[in-house]
Amino acid sequence: MHFEPYPFEKLTQLLEGITPNPAYSPIALTIGEPQFETPAFIQKSLSKHSEELRRYPKTAGETYLNDSMRGFVERRFGVKLQPNELISSFGTREVLFNFPQYYLFDKKEPIMAYTNPFYQIYEGSAIASRAKVIHLNLTEQNGFKPIINEAELAECDLVILNF
């Protein structure tokens, strides 16, 4: 199994040994780590409730958190989710890599579709899942909206849409 290096790793290698022009401020093309301090009210609340962090969280997530997230999705996107249609996690990478492997495990020749450009973890999960990939190209011509025809959709075992 061969996984491609992340684009940020490739960029780091490309930039090795290059001295930037001191007349310009470089643009940080990082992995999206926060570049600001945690707001004081969050620090205060975390400190106040830190004793509660001594156990692992529930696998299914806390009911109040799931209710809040489902409410957000309904308000923002007009989609009413059922409690079993939501996964709570500390980050997306692990879920997006592992879920397709779990879901496609018993498929003989799995097929998954996802948008292109894509979050590279989708490619890794497709490789690990032995899945054929249908790229849903986002272009100016299609208004940067994923388009999949009925025939492609019928053969897909999993479609990942992100926005």
PLM features: what roles do these ranges have?
Residues 2-91, 98:
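N-terminal small-domain helix-loop-helix segment of the aminotransferase-like
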